[in-house]
């Protein structure tokens, strides 16, 4: 893989042994290389890619690392909101997928995608969705976005047939859109921890 993986991307590895520094015993029993891991936010002095492993139970999440050379496939959140992908998903009748389809009917001035359990289900066709599942949304924003357009997005998201939350990804981290619109500031999750900021598109030393 030549492109640098970004947080929330799903990546497949060339071998189970490519997953490094995993302590949780359930991973060896449940995870195999045919299943993707999700890129998370962290830093490593060995230039490895930080990833998370999803288990069968909701509480089963494990953090690990992989060498970029061992990644053989990558699916981004944006790839999962192609309308044809959504319409042909085996989970098309589930409320989170219906919600994603509804959002594709509008042309947004930014790239966006689906993460979380809905993204995992769309990418793998593994039935981890149910009627009460949330829809986790991601907006990629390298530059500040128009507030009125974001308010329109929030209005449409509030009308979806499921609970939905949006994170906005900036060059310096990610923040909850509803928090930022409501308070004028938000907790920015960065690779080195979280910080409260009103300017998530600006680096703070």
Swiss-Prot record:
Q: Which GO molecular-function terms appear in the entry?
A: nucleotidyltransferase activity
Indicate yes or no for the key word Nucleotidyltransferase. Answer: yes
Keyword Transferase among record annotations:
yes
- Catalyzed chemical reaction(s): apo-[malonate decarboxylase ACP] + 2'-(5''-triphospho-alpha-D-ribosyl)-3'-dephospho-CoA = holo-[malonate decarboxylase ACP] + diphosphate
The record's Pfam families line, in alphabetical order, gives: MdcG, MdcG_N
Q: Which InterPro entries match?
A: Holo-ACP_synthase, MdcG_C, MdcG_N
Q: HAMAP family given for it? A: Malonate_MdcG (MF_00650)
What is this protein called in UniProt?
A: Phosphoribosyl-dephospho-CoA transferase
Question: To which species is this protein native?
Answer: Klebsiella pneumoniae subsp. pneumoniae (strain ATCC 700721 / MGH 78578)
